[in-house]
Each structure stands twice: as structure tokens, then as C-alpha cells.
Amino acid sequence: MVVLATVLAAGSAQADRLDDIKKAGVLRVAAFDSNPPFGFIDQKSKQIVGLDVDYAKALANKLGVTLELRSTNPANRIPLLTSGKVDFVLANFTITEERAKQLDFSIPYFSSGQQFLAKKGTLSSPDQLNGLRIAADKGTTNEIVLRRDFPKAVVVSFDDTPFAFTALRNGNVQAVTQDGPKLVSLLANLPDKEAYEIPPFTVSNDYMGVGIPKGEARLVAFVNETLLELEGNGKAAAIYDAWFGPNTPQPLPRLFKIGDKK
């Protein structure tokens, strides 16, 4: 049994979630459905697509199983994984020591810095963050960093990024904080994007990994090996270029490669 194997993994044999996935023929993955370009609903196909989804597809293909996506928001990622409702989380999931107490992570497959989106002229340096009303996704490292490092900022938490953007456009907050690449993508799709800007500074650098159930050593090894293989054969670069390459609405140079940080 999966639950029993997980409980016993720390004390004896390895857990066998990898075998369970192969036997079931399905890989269940939690992904965002409203956070482009990492995970969002394609208006034509009505399917979840994005950078994280492409990595999920690559993992499922390597296993030779069907991919089953489950929508999640930032606050629900860990509960979905620890309750056994999904096998992996691929949802712009920042690797932290606190989260690693509850789950395991793969090696990083993406890196970004925490930035801000505000109306032009509102924000130009980190010193100005204290005193502003700033929207953040609930339960994210962005929220944690903001509360810890800028105690005089008024942090307003939302279940998901689109709600934060609505608050910004309605004037309920003065800025939104998120990973830089995600902000670039969201800004590109705003109808009044000329009124907003992303100031050229970061307050932290984050690494994203695949969330994996705690104690599943074989599963971690499989994911890490597959990610390194994708980097080596050029498929990781192709995935990045599909969402951040020169022909996309939000071009960003690829500065981080899988394997740069273990």
C-alpha cells in the first residue's frame, strides 16, 4: 500500500510509489490553471497548458503512462501532495527548507527572482515597499519574504494571482509581487498594460522544483535523471523557448540550466 510504504520508508525499505504509478498507468500532477505561462487554460483547446505542463508531459512520457492534470492554487499544492491525491506538483513550486519538511523536491528546473508590478511611477526601489499595500499569493515564498523583510508593508493575501491583479487594477493595492517571469507574462496580457511596469529590482532569487511525496527515493531519482536528460538532449531549452523565447509575448533570456544547482 502507498500509505504504508510511505510510513515505513524512513525506517526500512524504499517506498514503491514509482511502481504504483507504472502499474496504474497514470501520472497525477497538480498544476496551475490560471498562472501563465507556467499553467493556464488554453482558450482554444480548453486544456491546461504551460511550461510546467510540458515538463509534466515529459515525465509521463518517460514513464510510458497517461498524464492526468489536477488544477491547484498556491495554497493547495502541499495538501494535494501529502494527502496522496496527486503524485507530483509542478506549479511554479519554490524549493524551501520549510516545505522540504513535508515533501521532497527534485533538482531545480527553473529559476527566477521575486519582483513587483505597479502603476508607472509608483515604485522604483525596495526601500519604497514599506508603507505600500502589496498583494501576494497566499502561502507562497513571495508572501513570506515580503512579511519577513518588509515589516512595514501592508501585505494583502489572495488565493491566486488573478485576484491580486484585480485588486491592483481596482486600486485596492498599490503593487503585486510574484516571480518575475510570471509578472512579465501577466503584464503582456493586460489590456491597459501601458499604465503598468515591473521595476528593475528583485528582493530574492528562487529555484523551482518538482514536488514529490516524502520518502520516495526512487521517484526523486527518476525525476532528477529525467530532468538532466531533458537538459542534455535540448528538450529543456525547447520547453523554455516555447514560453519565454524570442517569438513569445514575454521574451526572457535563459540564464539557468538544469544541473546548475543541485
Q: Where are the regions that the model predicts?
A:
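Extracytoplasmic small-molecule ligand-binding "clamshell" domains
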Residues: A15-N92
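Short helix-initiation/N-cap motifs at beta->coil->alpha
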Residues: V53, E68-P79, G121, K138, ...
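Short loop->beta-strand "edge-of-pocket" segments that line small-molecule binding or catalytic clefts
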Residues: G25-F32, V49, P126-T140, V154
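Periplasmic-binding protein-like
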Residues: F110-L117, G180, V184-L227, P246-K262
